[in-house]
């Protein structure tokens, strides 16, 4: 059994946004308060829990405190953009507690960008008394990654996606797919998402966007791939939770922060 938690389902600015507020979202509905997109996968076993985190947004500290995460066995990154990476320094707490480098999994482009922005996390600068906190592993689309932990192993299949002028990485965990921040998908990637029980998929807003699925884009892909259940994520302040929920098909629903579900393998 795998447990999945949507730690954050908001777009790059979250909801509400400083100076810009709630957009069309009803501030009285707690499901409209959205932190930046992140996702947690857990396997519970007799020896404990294995936890894999997807992305380190600026809200990561609060997300992990709310989810009571006290140990991480690995972090998978979807891409280099700030709303998915700029909380990375807060992984330091896990380095301190676990007394070992935190294993992070990145494609070549994301690894290069993280080292340029947060090089001290990978190698101590000259004269610094602070040790590095991260150990880098390379993600290659189509090559599964297995992360071991106290609860057993979690395997993720990286899937390449188009995201404007860069590629991003989606992941498949058994029969659960996570596809945030994408505007298109190669044929081989679509094939890798066949037969899903649950698909968590980008649906930024109603209007088209050059590097994200709109709601109609997401629904068209859901109809094509036919997962049993679909959850829309990366939601902009232009999408009110309840208004969106009411017009979606029965097997499709909006995400909300803290949403959890379990899937048999």
Locate predicted features:
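A conditional alpha-helix N-cap/helix-loop micro-motif detector
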Residues: 32, 57, 182, 208-215
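Thr-Gly-centered strand-to-loop micro-motif
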Residues: 158-159, 179-181, 201, 232-233
């Amino acid at each position: 059994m795998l447990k999945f938690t949507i730690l954050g389902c908001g777009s790059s600015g979250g909801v509400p946004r400083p100076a810009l507020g709630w957009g069309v979202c009803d501030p009285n509905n707690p499901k409209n308060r959205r932190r930046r997109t992140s996702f947690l996968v857990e396997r519970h076993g007799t020896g404990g829990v294995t936890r894999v985190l997807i992305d380190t947004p600026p809200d990561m500290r609060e997300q992990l405190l709310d989810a009571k995460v006290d140990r991480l066995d690995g972090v998978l990154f979807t891409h280099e953009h700030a709303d998915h990476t700029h909380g990375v320094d807060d992984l330091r707490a896990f380095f301190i507690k676990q007394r070992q480098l935190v294993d992070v999994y990145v494609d070549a482009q994301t690894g290069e960008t993280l080292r340029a922005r947060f090089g001290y996390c990978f190698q101590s600068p000259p004269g610094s008394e602070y040790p590095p906190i991260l150990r880098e592993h390379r993600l290659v689309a189509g090559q599964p990654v297995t992360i071991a932990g106290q609860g057993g192993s979690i395997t993720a299949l990286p899937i390449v996606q188009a995201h404007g002028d860069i590629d991003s990485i989606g992941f498949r965990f058994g029969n659960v797919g996570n596809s945030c921040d994408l505007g298109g998908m190669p044929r081989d990637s679509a094939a890798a998402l066949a037969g899903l029980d649950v698909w968590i998929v980008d649906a930024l807003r109603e209007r088209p966007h050059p590097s994200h699925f709109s709601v109609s884009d997401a629904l068209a892909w859901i109809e094509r791939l036919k997962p049993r259940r679909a959850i829309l994520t990366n939601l902009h302040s232009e999408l009110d939770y309840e208004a969106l929920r009411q017009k979606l098909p029965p097997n499709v629903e909006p995400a909300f922060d803290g949403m959890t579900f379990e899937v048999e393998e």
